């Protein structure tokens, strides 16, 4: 007899072997119908997999996150089933789960159209309505190869070649369609009803631009119809907020093919940039940072010594001059070590906090570029803290407090923390990494924050704390980082004189709050839907006259507002006021000021905040109100 322990600690006995589906059926008909898969001793398995020894078992249903991911993975297989019925010559590649969805890469003779995707979705719905069972068969490797050879699935054969030698692999049968996978998958298509194909894109085989282009069909799937509806509404809202669309509408920036991954900032966009940079500079100065500037291009030997050449060369732009090879800096950290090394440093100089709005370039694949979110040329609000081991915790706490306050100023109140641990490709010994990872854990504990850990996600030179902000649509964006580095000071021979007159290596803390300014501005645009808070708006108000008679007074009002430090624009066009209000509304200025004869005579301004009419105000009172609004945002949050 088998002893099966359930999550409530109850134990049930079964004849050996028993499947997850059979266990669910023995508990109740409702659970049997809802069972998507199972978890046996912590490992996900198909509902049909046999259990042959005493085990702890959990029934996975669509209510579980694992259940949702299994549904999404099975929907990807269903895409394959529909595509092969409609386009028999298509070659299936891979179909993984991604955040809130899935995709399938497909090799086709000609690109799919939106109409093709609609036809694929319709066929998927027809297949779901057939309510067929998905059958898993563990198949010998040689037989699996034969199956895909007979079907002409060359990409599946390439994938099998890359796999470790195994006796058998899971082949999932969707009626006449077969696909290979580690699984698990749903036992029946009835679980796949709440899905939607969302977009079509191109993707290179293995993500390499030297390889052939494939067609990628994206989709999403959920446990219930309401969850799917909510997701679609969120996607539609996200499309309205797309920073690329709003960047053009608000006249902030543009990108063009002649400079891939590089941004052309327009006057309004550059005003937004400068507002952010100047605000950050003020905050950093108050926190004891010293601003520096380091070269854009440095000799190859410098990057070899820092370790970047061995670990990051493929992402660096390289040039040569006068028989010397140079690299454009992808990071600011090695340059900051040179400033630290320029002179004899004492323990009394520590902590030394060096900040730079550093312009960096990384050779990102062209297919990965995406508006402001993924660029090749960018500026980081970068800083490096050189300190002793005893100062790590206090510096981490101070940084955490600074970061949280700044995020609140920008409108982000929901911040989550993750600790990224050593990657496979790294510099430094395991002892050094043990020390660095434990140092960050102690720092996070001292900050009183909860965190999750991400094995393998650290930088090559050290572990890092990642700060993720949640935007108005509930999306999470990684912005801030704090990285602990014992490696670079050693490689670049950084040292200081200790209290005992010995020489010691400083600890180096790499930290950023916004990350890439370009990307952070993209996040801000989408979070605020282009309707920025007053202190941040590139144009804070527009002043409009009703007739030419008020033009001079409009200029006086603009001059007074500008003298008070506000970014005010004039609209004195010979147009009806209703038209000017509507036209300026598209730019989402925080305030619109309308001036007619009455306002001119009474030395007042008629104020509209977004769509709200605030009435006629004394100009000095209005300025005081604006100043208080900014104080509330930046000081009182």
UniProtKB/Swiss-Prot annotation:
BP GO terms, sorted: threonyl-tRNA aminoacylation
Keywords: Aminoacyl-tRNA synthetase, ATP-binding, Cytoplasm, Ligase, Metal-binding, Nucleotide-binding, Protein biosynthesis, RNA-binding, tRNA-binding, Zinc
Spans annotated as Catalytic: 242-533
Taxonomic lineage: Bacteria, Pseudomonadati, Pseudomonadota, Betaproteobacteria, Neisseriales
Cofactor note as given: Binds 1 zinc ion per subunit.
Names of required cofactors: Zn(2+)
Protein's cellular compartments: Cytoplasm
GO cellular component terms given for this protein: cytosol
Function, in words: Catalyzes the attachment of threonine to tRNA(Thr) in a two-step reaction: L-threonine is first activated by ATP to form Thr-AMP and then transferred to the acceptor end of tRNA(Thr). Also edits incorrectly charged L-seryl-tRNA(Thr).
SUPFAM superfamilies membership: Class II aaRS ABD-related, Class II aaRS and biotin synthetases, TGS-like, ThrRS/AlaRS common domain
Subunit structure: Homodimer.
Record field: catalytic activity: tRNA(Thr) + L-threonine + ATP = L-threonyl-tRNA(Thr) + AMP + diphosphate + H(+)
Domain TGS span(s) in chain numbering: 1-61
Record: residues binding Zn(2+): 333, 384, 510
Enzyme Commission code: 6.1.1.3
Database matches in PANTHER family: THREONINE--TRNA LIGASE, CHLOROPLASTIC_MITOCHONDRIAL 2, THREONINE-TRNA LIGASE
Name of the protein in question: Threonine--tRNA ligase
A Pfam family of this chain: tRNA-synt_2b
Molecular function in Gene Ontology: ATP binding; metal ion binding; threonine-tRNA ligase activity; tRNA binding
InterPro entries membership: aa-tRNA-synt_IIb, aa-tRNA-synth_II, aa-tRNA-synth_II/BPL/LPL, Anticodon-bd, Anticodon-bd_dom_sf, Beta-grasp_dom_sf, TGS, TGS-like
Protein species of origin: Neisseria gonorrhoeae (strain ATCC 700825 / FA 1090)
Top-level EC class as recorded in UniProt: ligase
PROSITE patterns for this protein: AA_TRNA_LIGASE_II, TGS
Transmembrane segments: none
């Amino acid at each position: 007899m088998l002893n099966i322990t359930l999550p409530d600690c109850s134990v049930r006995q079964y004849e050996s072997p028993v499947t997850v589906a059979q266990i669910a059926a023995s508990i109740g008909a409702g659970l049997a119908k809802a069972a998507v898969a199972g978890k046996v001793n912590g490992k996900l398995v198909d509902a049909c997999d046999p259990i042959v020894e005493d085990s702890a078992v959990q029934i996975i249903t669509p209510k579980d996150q694992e259940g949702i991911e299994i549904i999404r993975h099975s929907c990807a297989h269903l895409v394959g089933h529909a595509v092969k019925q409609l386009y028999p010559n298509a070659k299936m590649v891979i179909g993984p789960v991604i955040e809130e969805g899935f995709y399938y890469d497909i090799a086709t003779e000609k690109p799919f159209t939106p109409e093709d995707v609609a036809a694929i979705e319709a066929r998927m719905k027809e297949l779901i309505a057939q309510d067929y069972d998905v059958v898993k068969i563990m198949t010998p490797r040689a037989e699996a190869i034969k199956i895909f050879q007979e079907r002409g699935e060359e990409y599946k054969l390439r994938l099998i070649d890359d796999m470790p030698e195994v006796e058998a692999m899971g082949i999932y049968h969707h009626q006449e369609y077969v696909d290979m996978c580690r699984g698990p998958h749903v036992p029946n298509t009835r679980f796949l009803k709440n899905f939607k194909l969302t977009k079509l894109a191109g993707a290179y085989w293995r993500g390499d631009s030297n390889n052939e282009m494939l067609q990628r069909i994206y989709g999403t799937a959920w446990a219930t119809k309401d969850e799917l509806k909510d997701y679609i509404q969120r996607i539609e809202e996200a499309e309205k907020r797309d920073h690329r669309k709003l960047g053009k509408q608000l006249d902030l920036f543009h990108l063009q093919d002649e400079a891939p991954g590089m941004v052309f900032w327009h006057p309004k966009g550059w005003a937004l940039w400068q507002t952010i940079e100047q605000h950050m500079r003020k905050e950093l100065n108050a926190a004891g940072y010293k601003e520096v500037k380091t070269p854009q291009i440095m000799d190859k030997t410098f990057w070899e010594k820092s370790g970047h050449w061995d670990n990051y060369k493929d992402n660096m732009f390289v040039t040569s001059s006068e028989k010397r090879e140079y690299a454009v800096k992808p990071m600011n950290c090695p340059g900051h070590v040179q400033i630290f090394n320029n002179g004899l440093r004492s323990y009394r100089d520590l902590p030394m906090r060096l900040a730079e709005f550093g312009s960096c370039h990384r050779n990102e694949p062209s297919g990965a570029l995406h508006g402001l979110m993924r660029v090749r040329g960018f500026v980081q609000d970068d800083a490096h803290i050189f300190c002793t081991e005893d100062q790590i915790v206090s510096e981490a706490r101070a940084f955490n407090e600074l970061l949280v306050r700044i995020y609140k100023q920008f409108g982000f109140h929901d911040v989550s923390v993750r600790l990224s641990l050593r990657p496979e490709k790294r510099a430094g010994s395991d002892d050094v990494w043990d020390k660095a990872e434990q140092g960050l854990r102690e720092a996070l504990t001292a900050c009183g924050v909860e965190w999750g850990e991400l094995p393998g996600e650290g930088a090559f030179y050290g572990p890092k704390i990642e700060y993720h902000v949640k935007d108005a649509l509930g999306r999470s964006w990684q912005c801030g980082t704090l990285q602990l580095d014992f490696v670079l000071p050693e490689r670049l021979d950084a040292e200081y004189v200790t209290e005992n007159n010995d020489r010691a290596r400083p600890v180096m803390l790499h930290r950023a709050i916004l990350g890439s300014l370009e990307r952070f501005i993209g996040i801000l645009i989408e979070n605020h839907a282009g309707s920025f808070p007053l202190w941040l708006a590139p144009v804070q108000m527009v002043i409009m006259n009703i007739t030419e008679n008020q033009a001079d007074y409009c200029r006086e009002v603009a001059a007074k507002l500008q003298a008070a430090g506000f970014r005010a624009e004039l609209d004195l066009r010979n147009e009806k006021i209703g038209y000017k209000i509507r036209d300026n509304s598209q730019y989402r200025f925080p305030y619109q000021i309308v001036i007619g004869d009455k306002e001119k005579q009474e030395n007042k301004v008629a104020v509209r905040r977004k769509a709200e009419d605030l009435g006629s105000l004394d100009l000095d009172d209005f300025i005081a109100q604006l100043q208080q609004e900014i104080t509330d945002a930046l000081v009182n949050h």
